[in-house]
Amino acid sequence: MFQDNPLLAQLKQQIQENLPKKEGTIKATEKGFGFLEVDSKTSFFIPPAYMKKCMHGDKVIAIIRTENEREVAEPQELVEQMLNRFIGRVKMFKGKLNVVPDHPQLKKMSLKAKTKKGLNPQEFAEGDWVVGHLIRHPLKDDNGFFVEISEKITDADDKIAPWWVTLAENDLPNSEPAGIDDWQIKDDADLERIDMTHIPFVTIDGESTKDMDDALYAKKNDAGDFELTIAIADPTAYITPDDEMDKVARERGFTIYLPGRNIPMLPRDLADELCSLIEGEIRPALCCTVTVSKDGVIGDDIQFFAANIKSHARLAYDNVSDWLETGSCEKWQPSEEIAAIVRDLYEFSQARAEWREKNAVVFPDRPDYRFELSEDNDVVAIHADMRRSANRLVEESMITANICAGKTLQGHFGTGVFNCHAGFKPEKIADVVELVNPEGTLEFTAESIATREGFAALRRWLSKQETTYLDNRIRKFQTYSEVSNQPLPHYAMGLDIYATWTSPIRKYGDMINHRMLKALILNKEPVQKPDDSVGEELALHRKHHKIAERNVADWLYARTLADAPENQTLFTGEIFDINRAGMRIRLLENGAAAFIPGSLIIDNKERIECNGDLGTVSIDKEVVYKLGDVLEVVLADVNQENRSLVAKPTQVFAELPVVEETQN
């Protein structure tokens, strides 16, 4: 009788129009109900029946009404859906395709699905990893949620899943670009390459490195100063800005480095062969010579030039470090000529490091964590590789080279691809001063730390403190590093200018700087200048690559440490973040990040306070942990689904003494 009654529908619409509406984000719970979060302080209950119209993370407009004496939200209009393109796993339900999103809050949702044209649904099995697209949504007047599968990533039990799934999730390629059959050098007709094949350049890399992009030569003169020459591989000899390969390189931005494998920016036949500075092979290179004084000061005689060079020795970090640190190496014994060059390079690097420690900023030594994989992609071991003397030798050479490029590009063009860092966020400077100089007895003022020199002086002071507590707190007040086409300073390094050109096989920005430096050599206009968007593009690429690297590592850590809770394996953790729920630590043995909830420190909410602003954890109002502290922990839980670790301190805090009542 009332079905399809237009008057009833009109009345219902009028009632709804008069009800208050709120816009917010859906927060789902495991119990079927949810909440509309309007802001950090306001939320409304959503009953299970209404939650069927939406999913966690959807941004919606909802009607607020009173039901059973309680304000509830009924989602009415979709502002922005949480899922668009996403990664999921196939679930078969009564023989039909469904997809479960690979997201912690959505793993209980099984969404009906179909394959796109050209994909055979018979080739999909339970648990397979896929790329899905949410094409129907109940709040769009569709009949339920519906997914189209556009790609199968890999089989359910494939051990390559951590890499392929993570790359697909971030929409990143999982292989190098296709090469071409016949690479030709396309130098400007006026570019003269100096024959430097007789100069005994050396390369120093990891044992397994194939894309060797820098070769070094140094000679100490009679005054004790160092004549340094840096030769860098030259892919822009083969790739012009108009080439299709240049577009591919720009789209990729960087070589992607993931635990256990990398995805090159350029084809491997170029990166690992034609451009790689292989021992005994003649290669085109872009070179820089400069004199560095015995006190570590970079001279004004910076010169860039094109050359043909030949590496005279392919050296490995560990072998060179052993030889420098102990005077001998079982695996490697240099000739007199190579020994002299390595010794001069080492002395140069010590002079530069000393100069930077006094005048700029030197980052503290932290290990590089390296996953060793079997052929079946199982983790065999996780190594903590400390940076040794040979690593520092190469690092100082590259920093020197990049300072030279920065000065040259700034002086001649006023533009280039520069790495920059603006120091502290302007609105946080007063907080920094209050933190480090509360009594006003130190040199650090709001005016001084806003300058590059003052910022560097503060960082040097922080590095000399007994604990890293202040350093950890202050990091939250710093800006992020950026890439810019303007010559701006790099506060975090304590340098006036910094422009990288030493890894053009792996970084597109370095290719642009190569073209700029070649224009300087030719005294011509550059064939390519960095446009205003290149910095943002490269920063976005770097962000996605970092996320992918972290996600793969988290997955591998969860796999590798699965038995640690049962075995009660002891680890050493360093606290790097504290919030009101607990603290985050890094396991120093392997680099894994783990969360310690407050309840696993002491299971009494009244006694514990985790203060994110102060970076402290207090029990009974007494600070027991703070940022930078190191503590012994065991893993309480390893969640394979969410790829997360939960840890627990081994330190047990005493119960409060029971106060007995006395009778009068």
From Swiss-Prot:
Its EC number is 3.1.13.1. It is found in: Cytoplasm. One of its GO terms (cellular component) is cytosol. Coiled coil: none annotated. Its main location: cytoplasm. It catalyses: Exonucleolytic cleavage in the 3'- to 5'-direction to yield nucleoside 5'-phosphates. Residues 193-521 form the RNB domain. Keywords: Cytoplasm, Exonuclease, Hydrolase, Nuclease, RNA-binding. One of its GO terms (molecular function) is exoribonuclease II activity. One of its GO terms (biological process) is mRNA catabolic process. Residues 568-650 form the S1 motif domain. It holds the Pfam family S1. It is an enzyme of class 3 (hydrolase). InterPro entries: CSD, NA-bd_OB-fold, RNase_B_OB_dom, RNase_II, RNase_II/R, RNase_II/R_CS, RNase_II/RNase_R, RNR_Ribonuclease. The keyword Transmembrane helix does not apply. Involved in mRNA degradation. Hydrolyzes single-stranded polyribonucleotides processively in the 3' to 5' direction. PANTHER family: EXORIBONUCLEASE 2, RIBONUCLEASE. Belongs to the RNR ribonuclease family. RNase II subfamily. This is Exoribonuclease 2. It comes from Vibrio vulnificus (strain CMCP6).
